From Swiss-Prot:
Cell membrane found in the keyword field: no
PANTHER family: 2-OXOGLUTARATE (2OG) AND FE(II)-DEPENDENT OXYGENASE SUPERFAMILY PROTEIN-RELATED
Cofactor: Fe(2+)
Record protein name field: 2-oxoglutarate-dependent dioxygenase AOP3
A Pfam family this chain is assigned to: 2OG-FeII_Oxy
Encoding gene (name): AOP3
Molecular function, one GO term: 2-oxoglutarate-dependent dioxygenase activity
Length: 411
């Protein structure tokens, strides 16, 4: 029965045997394109990050999250929602811009310790550097597969990286109201607080939504969660809440339905397990590593959920809305969520996201626009897209990307 369950494509991206121009490179290039066109993501078998480094990063994350709250709250950034975020002690995350640059990694640990922590800084920087090399390989493969090699250097030079270190704690039971309450968000100016949100029909749903927003995420203070796992899409409320799937943001949902009688026990239990609701990323690409405990689930075009199981030396490569727009819709940004089901176990995940630099105009290369594939999105500055997320129209749109720059959007 298990063998019939849908699975993401698994592609070997070992840099020891994968060289540009080789027959393997050509084969992998084709596989990457097909996987992204079909699923918007894939699992990658890698050797760029050693098991020793993976273990060291996990220990570093455990040390970071074990710090006193007042220390963790010093992880603040100039832009709101890009620093430390905690929700009821059940989920936390750190944000590190340009984590692949040692100086920036040092700045991060200096926020937490008076003298910093050079060992952890170097470990984070090395980890981010290895994942960044992998990301650049993937994006090179993508652009080559569409015959736009001339665009590779410009594209790679127009982006930067942000790392997210994340911790989820599963509930001790399935009490779906146990986690609704106050949150702490130190790097933010405001919260998307969905306690007792009221939907369009006037029904109150007891959901706590805290959104950690950076350069490329929607802070959605009107999200309705709980009437089925995909309520964001079905009720015309933007589901683009990003965390483990967004370059600059983390949305943490801890709590579920408290007042909707139409929701069955099974659906309510699923919602109670959500550490992150169904959403798409805003980044170009994301590389996610799940440490030992699974939780990430990806939605297929057929509407089925694929639960991605952690495996040694594997990561998940996922496309975001920015890549979808750049590639003229050829590559979708898939809906995904985090659902922690193992009781009394802590889940750690680390992710690196590539994002367009401020001022760079995202515009599909002419080679990707033809009669079969008419232009799907207007050129736009990523910062303008981010600002649109904060408007009422941006929050309410089923697809913020489509509403902002889709050719059919009334703009």
């Amino acid at each position: 029965m298990g063998s019939c369950s849908p699975q993401l494509p698994l592609i070997c991206l070992s840099d020891q045997t994968l060289k540009p121009g080789s027959s393997k490179w050509v084969k992998v290039r084709s596989d990457v394109r097909k996987a992204l066109e079909d699923y918007g993501c894939f699992e990658a078998k890698i050797d760029q990050v050693s098991m020793e480094l993976q273990g060291s990063v996990l220990k570093a994350m455990q040390e970071l999250f074990a710090l006193p709250t007042e220390a963790k709250q010093r992880n603040v950034c100039p832009k709101p929602f890009t620093g430390y975020l905690s929700h009821n002690g059940l989920s936390e995350s750190f944000g590190i811009k340009d984590a692949n640059i040692l100086e920036k990694a040092h700045e991060f640990t200096q926020q937490l310790w008076p003298e910093g922590n050079k060992s952890i800084s170097k470990m984070i920087q090395l980890y981010a550097e290895k994942l960044a090399e992998l990301d650049m390989m993937v994006r090179r493969l993508i652009l080559e597969s569409y015959g736009i090699e001339y665009f590779i250097d410009e594209h790679l030079n127009s982006t930067y990286y942000r790392m997210r270190l994340m911790k989820y704690i599963a509930r001790p039971d399935n009490d779906i109201t146990a986690a609704v309450g106050a949150n702490v968000d130190n790097g933010a100016n405001d919260n998307a607080d969905g306690d007792a949100n009221v939907n369009d029909d006037g029904a109150s749903i007891g959901v706590k939504v805290n959104v950690d927003v950076g350069d490329d995420v929607n802070d959605n203070d009107s999200v309705n969660i709980g009437v089925g796992v995909d309520i964001n899409v079905e009720t015309n409320v933007n589901g683009d809440l990003d965390a483990e799937a967004n370059g600059d943001a983390t949305a943490w949902v801890v709590g579920a339905v408290s007042g909707n009688a139409s929701v069955g026990a099974k659906e309510a239990n699923v919602d109670a397990e959500l550490g992150l609701p169904s959403h798409t990323d805003k980044s170009l690409t994301g590389i996610i590593y799940q440490h030992q405990i699974d939780g990430l689930e990806v939605k297929t075009k057929e509407g089925k959920w694929i639960r991605v199981k952690p495996a040694p030396n594997t990561v998940i490569v996922i496309a975001g809305d920015a890549l979808c727009a750049l590639m003229n819709g050829r590559i979708p940004s898939p809906y995904h969520r985090v659902r922690v089901t193992e009781k009394k176990k802590t889940r750690y995940a680390a992710a690196l996201f590539s994002n367009p630099k401020e001022g760079y105009i995202i515009d599909s290369p002419k080679e990707l626009v033809d009669e079969k594939h008419p232009r799907a999105f207007k050129p736009f500055d990523f910062v303008d897209l981010f600002n649109f997320y904060h408007t009422e129209a941006g929050r309410r749109a089923p697809s913020t990307l489509q509403a902002f720059c889709g050719v059919s959007a009334g703009k």
